[in-house]
Amino acid sequence: MIALLILSLTCSASTYRLQGFTNAGIVAYKNIQDDNIVFSPFGYSFSMFMSLLPASGNTRIELLKTMDLRKRDLGPAFTELISGLAKLKTSKYTYTDLTYQSFVDNTVCIKPSYYQQYHRFGLYRLNFRRDAVNKINSIVERRSGMSNVVDSNMLDNNTLWAIINTIYFKGIWQYPFDITKTRNASFTNKYGTKTVPMMNVVTKLQGNTITIDDKEYDMVRLPYKDANISMYLAIGDNMTHFTDSITAAKLDYWSFQLGNKVYNLKLPKFSIENKRDIKSIAEMMAPSMFNPDNASFKHMTRDPLYIYKMFQNAKIDVDEQGTVAEASTIMVATARSSPEKLEFNTPFVFIIRHDITGFILFMGKVESP
């Protein structure tokens, strides 16, 4: 059996304009082929959305299509996005922090209308040829607490514009695993069988068997304490088929199918960190913004900018107490009943989800914990 783990932020009917936003991040994830993966669909989609705001011409048309938006829906969708971010409240047990920064070179002429509308979200002017890496890292760390987000491989003397967003999540399980019951156990993947620390909890959770086409998957929801954020775990024989089936709407539908059951749940502790060049993935969705001849960001500047680099760094740690996950996404532009036993002892995928808004914060796959 192969397992799927989903940590996510759910789409409600009131945020229908943002289902395309969520789906863009899911599609990006599906184009990653590594074994152990941690990825932030929200971080990816947020960067694409914020590059849509200054875009024009074919660049705007492609980005609107990526977000499944009509031109007249862009303003309302932006309002809904900001409203959704406000719902990610920090509590005594859960900390969620999102930041956005747009760094523009001093030589680029920003239109006053764009500056007036968006500068409050984090618009900075600087000289990219004078210690830009340290200056940007200092600003991002001051705002997010995350250090060394960019390096000299991401920025160079050609850089004129950099979009950076960060996400940090720390959540305590509503029903923590008992650390005294963690035992070494077998975990089997395509490479063979290994011994891993397996956590254990017996408690009432929401779960069910869901059917996709003719295939069945056992799914269970692990809530975080006082957060409206949950981790969804699923296990079945064909997780590639499960992953291919994921959309924002289907995640909503599956979550509504879950009912209360008592589980004896076993889940391995795991930690994953990825640093990934995601330009080729974004280029499949909106190719013109990466083309020096076709890119247009004329709602921000008349300077002929185009995106030439895009990265995402992400990591996640899951243990008996809860989850810590963080990600930074960087776009760089230049000119031009009785306890039911459920053991995750084979590879699984994860998604992090806020059960109100529908934004998927983190998603990934564990082949070898």
Curated annotation (Swiss-Prot):
UniProt GO cellular component terms: extracellular space; host cell plasma membrane; membrane; virion membrane
Membrane topology: Peripheral membrane protein
Pfam families xref list: Serpin (PF00079)
Gene3D superfamilies per record: Alpha-1-antitrypsin, domain 1, Antithrombin, subunit I, domain 2
Keywords: Host cell membrane, Host membrane, Membrane, Protease inhibitor, Serine protease inhibitor, Signal, Virion
Induction statement: Expressed in the intermediate phase of the viral replicative cycle.
Molecular-function GO term, any one: serine-type endopeptidase inhibitor activity
Disulfide bond sites: none
TM annotation in the entry: none
Subcellular location: Virion membrane; Host cell membrane
Family matches, as CDD domains: serpinO_SPI-3_virus
Signal peptide annotation: 1-15
Similarity section: Belongs to the serpin family. Orthopoxvirus OPG040 subfamily.
Assembly and interaction partners: Interacts with A56 protein.
Free-text function comment from the UniProt entry: Prevents cell to cell fusion via its interaction with A56 protein. The A56-K2 complex associates with components of the entry fusion complex (EFC) presumably to avoid superinfection and syncytium formation.
Protein name, entry field: Superinfection exclusion protein
Organism: Vaccinia virus (strain Ankara) (VACV)
